[in-house]
A protein has these predicted regions:
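N-terminal helical cap/lid subdomain that shapes the substrate entry/recognition surface
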Residues: 2-93
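Residue-level marker of regulatory loop/turn positions in helix-turn-helix DNA-binding domains and
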Residues: 79, 100, 133
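Asp-based, Mg2+/Mn2+-dependent phosphohydrolase catalytic module
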Residues: 1-3, 88, 104-106, 110-209
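Conserved phosphate-coupling serine/threonine residues in phosphotransfer and NTP-handling enzymes
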Residues: 12, 101-103
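Short beta->alpha linker loops
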Residues: 19, 42-46, 81-82, 103, ...
Length: 209
């Protein structure tokens, strides 16, 4: 079976999107960008892109980075219900997987501290500091697919954010969107499917898409 599966992290596998929305909304109140719906606009973007695009002042960057590090040390990385079962089924079937996230390696370290076995479910892990261009550029998905030896056109991509969904579509993958961050009606209708969670979704259903 020559297929692979590429997963985003926040809002797809772990329930953190609402926490990050609150964090970045508070940052935008303290360091106003003048951007409407700022916390939603930056979803899926890596930290470097956020800081260089919206906070060119180096002092502000340092203060925001310190606040983010403190925030990520304190939050609980809760894995969504059904996720481990789904990942285990893929592994048991020998279907290669990659985690493709805009998060940096330091944030991943904090996640692994809470869930030491989490990384064992993936054949490759691509973090935001491993690519030169952030989502919506599809570079990260091309890299993830290359790492598992499967063309992107033979991959499923699980995403929740507009930038991640666009990156998945632009790399030619079948995108399955999680309605965790966006309302169903706000999700790009070019996606292959929309699901609410992994609770009632399994690999057999994925393979029919």
């Amino acid at each position: 079976m020559n297929i692979g599966v590429l997963f985003d992290l926040d809002g797809v596998l772990i329930d953190t999107e609402s926490l990050y929305t609150q964090f970045w909304s508070e940052i935008n109140n303290t360091y106003p960008t003048g951007v409407d719906n700022f916390a939603y606009k930056i979803k899926g973007c890596n930290l470097e892109r956020i800081l260089t695009t919206y906070y060119p002042d180096t002092d502000s960057q340092k203060e925001i980075l310190n606040a983010l590090n403190k925030f990520e040390e304190e939050i609980q990385y809760r894995i969504f219900p059904g996720v481990i079962k789904f990942l285990s089924d893929l592994k048991n079937r020998g279907i290669p997987t990659a985690l493709v996230t805009s998060s940096d390696i330091e944030k991943m370290r904090k996640l692994y501290n809470q869930h030491p076995s989490f990384k064992n479910y993936f054949d490759s892990i691509i973090t935001g500091d491993m690519v030169s261009k952030s989502k919506p550029n599809p570079e990260c998905f091309f890299k993830g697919a290359s790492q598992i030896g499967i063309p992107t056109t033979n991959c499923y991509v699980f995403e929740d954010s507009p930038s991640g969904i666009k990156a998945g579509l632009d790399c030619g993958a079948k995108v399955i969107a999680l309605a965790t961050t966006l309302l169903r009606q706000d999700i790009d209708n070019s996606v292959a499917a929309i699901i609410d969670s992994f609770v009632d979704f399994d690999v057999e259903k994925m393979l029919l898409i």
